[in-house]
Amino acid sequence: MSQRAAPHDESERDALDPYGAATHAVFNQPTELVDFNLFSGDAALQDGVAREGTGWASNELAALGARLGSAETLELGSLANRNPPELDTHDRYGNRVDLVRYHPSYHQLMRLAVEQGLHASPWTEPRPGAHVARAARYYMQAQVEAGHGCPITMTFAATPSLAKEPDLARHWLPKIHARVYDPRNIPAAEKQGLTIGMAMTEKQGGSDVRANTTRAIALGRDAMGEAYELVGHKFFVSAPMCDAFLTLAQAPGGLTCFLAPRWRPDGTKNPIQIVRLKRKMGNVSNASSETEWRGALAWRVGPEGRGVATILEMVAATRFDCMIGSSAGMRMAAAQALDHCRQRKAFGALLIDQPAMRAVLADLALEAEASLALTLRVARALDNRAAEPREDAFARIAAPLGKYWICKRTPAHAYEAMECLGGSGAMEDSPMPRLYREAPINAIWEGSGNVQCLDVLRAISRAPQAFDAYFAEIDSARGANRALDAHVAALKDDMRDLGDFEERARDLCDRLALALQASVMVRNAPAASADAFCAARLEGRGARNWGALPKGLDLAEIVKRALPR
C-alpha cells in the first residue's frame, strides 16, 4: 500500500488540516473587488469631473463612491438580477391589477438613485456643471446595477417635454422632481414621489414610430389639459409600474405625444393592461412589458401632429444616459479584470506584470477612459447649451455619435475583460456574466446603430452649424498628435461629398467618433494614455484584437492609472 507523504513538521500539519480531512490549501486566488471607492479609485473620473467644471461636487461624489463600492451595495445589484420581477395580471379574486412585483434590492437601488437626484437634479438645482455632476453619479451607480437606471433615466428625460404644457407641469413636475421614492401601487395624487416611463414602439414599427397605429380620440379639456382616449398597444414598455407614461398615438391631426397615467384622477385604474413581461438576456432587474391600451385616459403634450418633435428632447436625454451606462459597464469590467490580474499569479509572475496581459489590460483601460471622457464632454455641452449656441450645436452631433460608438464598443470590451479572469469570469457568481449580458442592451435601446448614424446625417444636413461645431472641437487639438491630424485631414476630405452618406454611414460615424474621442484624450488625458489611444486607434493597423498595441507605449503607466484600488 502507498502511504501519504508526511507533513514537514507538526505546525504545518495542523495549519493545513487540523481534522485530518483537508485535501488542499487555497492560495493564489484573488479577493473579491468590494469595499472600494468608485470615485476616489477612478483617476479618469476624478480628472474628468474637475476638467468639466464640477470640482464643487468632488466631496459629495467621493462619499457616494464609497457607499456604492461597499460590499452591501454591490450585493444589491446581484440580488436584483438573481430575483427578476414577476407579473400578476389579476388578484386572487379575478380583479385586473397589472401589478409587477420587484425584489426589495431593486427598490433599495431605486431609492438610493432618487435620493441622489439622478432623476432630476439638473432641473431642480441648475448650476454650472449640474449635468456633469449627475453624469458622474449615474456613472458610479450604473456600475453597481444597470436595470434600475431605466426608470431613473426616463423620469429625468420627461421634464423637458412636460414643461411645454403648463397645466401638466404644475400637476406633475413637483412630485416627479421630489427626492422621494414611493413604489406603492396607488394613484399619483396619494404619493409623495413619482416616476415616468416611455411607451412608443409598436409591433409593426419598432424605431419607425410614424408607423404607429394606436388611436387617440379627443374627449375635451379637463383640469390637466386636453384629454384623449387611447386605443391600441405598445410592444416595449419598460418599468411598467411607473406612475405615468409619455407615449405616441395617432390623433386626428397626426402622430401626437401624450401623458397617460397608470391611475385615473378619480382613483380608478387606467386601462393600460400588461400582457406579459419580456424575457430579456440582460437588464433583468428592470421589467419590460407588452401592453394593450383599452381606452386609456391621456393628456396631450404639444400640438397634434408634432409628437416626434415634442418627445425628441426626451429621447435625446435617454440616449445620453445610454452613453453613461455603457461607459460605466466598461469601467466596471476593466476594474474587475485589473483587480483580478494584480493579485493572480501564473507561470511565476503576477498576470498584471506579464507583457501580453498588460497590453490587454491597458487597451481595456484606454477604451473605458476615452468613453468616459467623451461622455463628460457631452455633459458639459448640455450644461452650456442654453447660453452658448455652439455648445448646443456640438451636442446635436456628439450625442448620437457617442451613443452609437460607445454602446457598440461595450460588448467586445466586456467579453475581453471576462477572458482576463479565465474560467472564474464565466461563473454566475462573478459579476462578469451580468456585465456581458448587459453590454449589448444600450446599443439597441433608444435607437440602434443605423438610427444613430442617420441622426448624425440629419444633424449635418439640417443644422450645418453642428458640423462646424464638431470640427471646431476636433481642431482644438490640432498639432498635438500627428496620427490625429492625419485622421482628421482624411476625414474632412472624405466628407466633402455626402451624397452617399447612408451607404458609408457606419464608416464615417466610426471615424467621426474616434476623432472626437482622440481629440478629448489628447487635450486632457496623461500623455501615456493619449499617445497610446491615438497610436492604437488611428494609425491604420487594420483589424485587431484587444491588446494588439503598437510598440513603444507606456503600458505600465496606463494600467497603474486605471487600478480601482
Predicted regions and their residues:
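A short core secondary-structure module
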Residues: G225-P271
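Extended, charge-enriched "interface" segments that sit outside catalytic cores
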Residues: M1-R127, A146
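Internal helix-loop-helix
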Residues: N95-P187, V237-A239, E438, W445, ...
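Alpha-helix capping/hinge segments and adjacent helical runs
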Residues: R4, S11-A22, G41, G48-A66, ...
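C-terminal helix-coil-helix/basic helical segment that borders enzyme active sites and/or dimer interfaces
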Residues: E369-K403, M418-E419, K492-A505, C509
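Flexible, small-/acidic-enriched active-site or ligand-binding loops
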Residues: T268-R294
